[in-house]
Amino acid sequence: MTRMKKHLRRIALILAVLFALGVLAAAGTNAVVMLSAKRYFLSNEGAAQDANFDAIVVFGCGVTAQGAPTYMLRDRLETAAKLYFEGAAPKILVSGDHGRSDYDEVNVMKRYLIEKGVSSQDVFMDHAGFSSYETVVRAKEVFLCERPLLVTQRYHLYRCVFAARAAGLEAFGVCAEGPV
């Protein structure tokens, strides 16, 4: 084998090992997040029975060009409204992107909740919820939540609960999964 081929083979092996290590690191990090957050997941019934939360926090996830919540966002809002009416928390904090004048998740979210019968006075809007982390930090620092109930889909809830707990909140989460 020529010297060049040996050299290329060695480089390929090093790259393969580095790639495998990267995959293992990502999988390990994901496992830590999931295992540490899952114990703070509640069922809808469990959240309503606890009923000791400052607010229900709903994470934005898009609105249509017509100004309606996306299917996933509707699931989150429906779950939040149900929890609110069951007495899980006295307030709902909707958090999402309103960084441009032509895109406004939070007002769409608030309007949807009001149409479902939630009192306008009980819905607070975080117009700067550009990421899950920013949402939980702002829930604590701006909206003074100490014990929020986070509502989003399961795949996203692990990260949200983990971030909230890391930020010092006594956060719990409820999965928004399909029609409530």
Predicted regions and their residues:
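N-terminal type II signal-anchor transmembrane helix
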Residues: 3-46
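Short, intrinsically disordered low-complexity segments
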Residues: 2, 8-9, 75, 146
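A structural signal for short, hydrophobic/glycine-enriched beta-strand patches
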Residues: 31-180
